[in-house]
Amino acid sequence: AARKRLFKPIFGCEMYVAPRRLDQMEKEKDGRRYHLIVLAKNETGYHNLVKLVSKSWTDGFYVRPRTDRFELEAHREGLIICSACIAGEVTRKILSGDLEGAEEAVQWYKRVFGDNYYLELQRHEVKDPDQRANRETFPLQQRANARLIELARKYDVKLICTNDCHFVEQED
């Protein structure tokens, strides 16, 4: 049906990445995890995405299903990786003042995924007083975006503008 209508689906997942190995589960070291957008650009990528997601549930579950850098590298073929929201590794490290860690992460993802790695810029200015979380997020995004642009230029990583969307309809 998709081919008849010239509709090309893009399969992907916002995954959680363990700070160390997916089989390590110490609360102090492994309780936090990073967000990462993983998209399949072809059939091989789709199969690798399914492997990553499945293994995150069966072998990496600690509070949430998690993958790690080792699994990402092992199943990198056919995947597009995007740095995600302010809970992504690069952005979180920028916001915590760990600029060396942010640079290391960009270099690692660029080395492993090459031109299939993108840094995400997000700008969610929400003026609705009932939308507290987004209102608090905006200044953080602004601060991170400036540094993300610098990192993209320094390491020749493409930038994309995205939204942290999880629902189609606002009332959902």
Question: What residue spans do the PLM features occupy?
Answer:
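Phosphodiester-processing cores and adjacent nucleic acid-binding clamps
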Residues: 1-172
